[in-house]
Amino acid sequence: MSNQESPGGVSRRALLKSTALGSLALAAGGLTLPFTLRRAAAAVQQATGDTTRIVWGACSVNCGSRCALRLHVRDDEVVYVETDNTGDDRYGDHQVRACLRGRSIRRRINHPDRLNYPMKRVGKRGEGKFVRISWQEALDTLADRLKSVVAQYGNEAVYINYSSGIVGGNITRSSPSASPVARLMNCYGGSLNQYGTYSTAQIACAMPYTYGSNDGNSTSDIENSKLVVMFGNNPAETRMSGGGITWYLEQARERSNARMIVIDPRYTDTAAGREDEWIPIRPGTDAALVAGIAWVLINEDLVDQPFLDKYCVGYDEKTLPAGAPANGHYKAYILGEGDDGIAKTPQWASRITGIPTERIIKLAREIGMSKPAYICQGWGPQRQANGKLTARAIAMLPILTGNVGINGGNSGARESTYTITIERLPVLENPVKTAISCFTWTDAIARGPEMTASRDGVRGKEKLDVPIKFLWNYAGNTIINQHSDINKTHEILQDESKCETIVVIDNFMTSSAKYADLLLPDLMTVEQEDIIPNDYAGNMGYLIFIQPATSAKFERKPIYWILSEVAKRLGDDVHQRFTEGRTQEQWLQYLYAKMVAKDPALPAYEDLKRMGIYKRKDPNGHFVAYRDFRRDPEAHPLKTPSGKIEIYSSRLAEIAARWQLEKDEVISPLPVYASTFEGWDDPLRSQYPLQLFGFHYKARTHSSYGNVDVLQAACRQEVWINPLDAEKRGIKNGDMVRVFNQRGEVRLPAKVTPRIMPGVSAMGQGAWHDANMTGDRIDHGACMNTLTTHRPSPLAKGNPQHTNLVDIEKV
């Protein structure tokens, strides 16, 4: 796929860039895009005059980038939003420019569906029928129900559901184990713990078995690379803002001229106009591709044998750990000398992945002959049922070629980021030591005491003693919208004898809020004071001081006030432990003083407040994962049992022998390929022939911003389908279709495009569920989780939400 100039003098890359941007501009319609930005800004300034003030805020939703916003406020209303305009805007010290989501935040602040008053449910869960109540009644009821559950069942029956709507906050942070809700519960005897995330369950679990952690080189280090290979990594949509890494990817490649290969079932926006080659692959088969590449590397003597001998365990017989079976090493597995007796040739890999044999061989030689090579993976490939094997397998490519711990190389993980470490609101120690995977909370409601350590991944004890009876849900949509199998989840939550109380604290009547027993209106982050750091932002760290843009409207309250009032009702000792006598602003001042004590280069509190944003480049230039280990493995061992890279993991071998697994589940000490349920070769494909996976969509961050009209208009919810599959079904581009399987049905327009592999379909995840749950349950909002499964992955017990089989028909 050449980037040479066409006869008219326009390169393919330039053409794709210009048409993609132009299409978005036309689709966006009412959005202010860069073409008219200065003119619009001047018009606003002229119209508002001297009565307008500018307040620094931030978008702190879970794309992770956390971009600065400059909110123009007049008469206590946000009338205009712009973004960071500080500094010289040069590479390494650039302006943190928000994407269209952050720039549309005014429409979220003033949305007609904002929650304004505390309410209690009067209909059935999910019907969305509520009546307004006073804050006193709401807080008294909440405290009484919490006391009752703890008295009857114990603190293990209380659970803080996974949520990431304000993942960037500090005082306002929603991440369950680090939220103010967790602090409150830890002051009141604790609550059932959770581990893992919906974003990274498999990779965060798997990579530490190889490296002891999950680090990768920063994207900026690509300026030292000769080759970039991206497995399912799509920063142009997942990290698309100026606070994200797309800018770094482009700028670093401008400096290195590194060739970039994108391996993905979908021709993503990261690929379009940027890549040198797109290699489409069947979902869930990346580990087979890696094995086919490894066969070529080994047989053509392209592996870095000295690196493997010095730094690794389990590559061949001489580095195999004690207790491992003969020929239990990785080299034997690849050459067909292991238990299965199958050589992982490129021909073998081609049948599984759908990639031509010749292309696998060519890719292997490119990787083996290009050093340094930046080989990375996004979080999509690991969000499969066999994702933990995929994550470890992709890491084998930099391991085999000795690209770990060097500039321009990588570990095979997703990119790491330089951040300015902030002092978080302390959540205190949780007295309850039992934990479940964050994905299995519906199981813990439905069959809690049946859940065990060896079958369900319960940690801290052999089994749960009680089911979940009280559910907190703060700034999250994972009760329904972002959790799997919505119809099954609905049935579980409908039974009020199971989970007795659900408390939702949010800004909108989300799909999850409809299931609340008590529904409390929270302030947005731009309506209260907080200090947040960057994340996923290359090698420039920054802090943003958020100040309230407007006063609190109606009866909306900040989360710290809500929980402080609950703490009062739980006892004076609980209130004192929770607040320590501080207001929200006093907590910020206290925590920031601790930061400055550790990092004197930071500006003073009042200076940061005045500046709005503070930036600092990584003093080491680029983050290089495991650099110290590479330089001196004896002085800087990894956090693995051997202190080395563990290609063969004795810990995984022990787990595989002890845990209870289904016949189609695999836990292996080696990074092997394994088929899985609802994979490309599942017999169920005779009924549901299309694989379906989700992707992060530009119009939303998960479900955040999913109710903003202009973003919905700019980026319609569609199902991607290849022209070959569409033709078989009589489907044309734009046709309304039904996507369905044994779990549910959604309806939405079809996007017929060669940008998706045949036999595969894809939908943007996070669309708001919209179905008549007392009727046909057809989801006209087209939330992908109407179609996904509750069945967790074997090792991490995490969400396999990209492993699905469906069919598509024209309506």
Task: Enumerate the predicted regions with their spans.
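Glycine/threonine-rich phosphate-binding loop and adjacent beta-strand/alpha-helix elements that clamp
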Residues: V526-A552, A567-R569, Y648
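Extended redox/cofactor-interaction regions of prokaryotic respiratory oxidoreductases
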Residues: S2-N3, P176-I263, T270, A288, ...
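Long, contiguous, secondary-structure-rich segments that constitute the structural scaffold
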Residues: I559-M611, S703-Y705, D709-W720, L724-V811
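A glycine-rich phosphate-binding loop feature that marks nucleotide/adenosyl-phosphate handling sites
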Residues: S163-S164, K310-V313, I367, N410-T421, ...
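Active-site phosphate/pyrophosphate-binding segments
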Residues: A326-I445
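N-terminal export/assembly segments and adjacent metallocofactor-ligating motifs
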Residues: S2-L302, G328, K461, K469, ...
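Phosphate/diphosphate-binding loops
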Residues: E500-T501, P548-S564
